[in-house]
Curated annotation (Swiss-Prot):
Tissue-specificity statement: Expressed by the skin glands.
Species of provenance: Pelophylax ridibundus (Marsh frog)
Descriptive protein name: Brevinin-2Rb
Membrane-spanning intervals of the chain: none
Cysteine disulfide links: 23-29
UniProt cross-references to InterPro entries, sorted A to Z: Antimicrobial_frog_2 (IPR012521)
Length: 29
C-alpha cells in the first residue's frame, strides 16, 4: 500500500544519507 511505499522511500533516503555521511567521516567509499 501507500504507507509501505512511503516507508520504503524514507528508509532508502535514510540509508543513502548515512552512507554519504559514513563516506565523508571514515573515508571508506
Amino acid at each position: 500500500g501507500l504507507m509501505s511505499t512511503l516507508k520504503g522511500a524514507a528508509t532508502n533516503a535514510a540509508v543513502t544519507l548515512l552512507n554519504k555521511l559514513q563516506c565523508k567521516l571514515t573515508g571508506t567509499c
